[in-house]
Amino acid sequence: MTKNKQKGLIYATTTAFLWGILPIALIGVLVTIDPFTTTFFRFLIAAVILTPALICKGKLKHRKKYFEKKIILQFSIAGVLLCINYALYIFGLNKTSAEAAQVMMQVAPVCLLLAGVFLFKERFSKTQWLGLIIFISGLIMFFSPRYEDVFTELNTYGSGLMILLAAALTWVFYAIFQKTLLKDFSAQETMVVFYWIGVLFFFPLSTFESLVNLTTFQWLLVIFCGLNTLVAYGSFSEALTHIEASRVSAILATTPLITLVFVQISPVTVLIPEPLTLTVILGAFFVVTGSIITSSAKN
């Protein structure tokens, strides 16, 4: 294995690990402060650290392009979509569980592939269709103990899943817009703009009075969530420069399993784990396996 591939695998694994434990930290914060304020700090910490880092390293090479009308419009649409994605995700997480949130978010890359088929006439192989069937079967198995919550009563948990599904679909549209921006900018050049858009978007929606109620441990969780946002996306971008996107997707598909494990050993006491029946565990594995097959199979 070449050094580039080794680096790529390390970056991708880092991203999967950070995204796997992120919802656990968020739940620890959400018991005290609201979703908007939590998300504001995620964007603020990432923006404040990344901006001077890029300036000092001279990596903002296309600053003049930022002010072109077409580019401003593209950044605005993509940035708002990302903000909506973050908001929907954290509201859905607040109504469900860490494991459910990460399983539902696996819908996003699968939907992105399907968007390529229907919007851009890309090919979808028989193996990929098989992966999609396994993926959907996994979703049904994972949420089978919650059947009444989701399909009959549509209570807090069921509505949370619908919100998470909306978050996943919003991410698909964001990814399509970001893909057009990556023709003119590096991933870091786009993310620093998105972070500041997030700061401006969530600032007026935030309520800072509740911050005085945060414990020292919760403040550490807030800082961790901001650093997680920055490092995870940075690692994700670096992984894509070293190994194929399909390999990165395959590694990131393991995120729900990481969450499933760490929920059981987390020091965050307010967590309510999903019932770990054999069907639920197999469902999680099917979701991961189906996602890997769908993203990695040759077109």
What does each model-identified segment do?
Residues 32-84, 111, 115, 169-177, ...:
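Transmembrane alpha-helices of multi-pass small-molecule transport proteins
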Residues 14-16, 41, 100-107, 177-198, ...:
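Helix-helix packing/entry segments at the starts of transmembrane helices
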Residues 49, 109-133, 257-282:
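C-terminal transmembrane-helix exit sites in multi-pass transporters
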Residues 43, 144-145, 218, 253-299:
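C-terminal-most transmembrane helix of multi-pass membrane proteins
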Residues 12, 24-27, 50, 112-114, ...:
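Transmembrane alpha-helical segments that form core, pore/gating elements
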Residues 1-40, 88, 150-180, 221-222, ...:
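Glycine-/small-residue-enriched transmembrane alpha-helix faces in small-molecule transporters
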Residues 21-23, 58-105, 141, 223-243:
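Specific transmembrane alpha-helical segments of multi-pass solute transporters/efflux pumps
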Residues 29, 38, 42, 92, ...:
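Hydrophobic/aromatic residues within transmembrane alpha-helices
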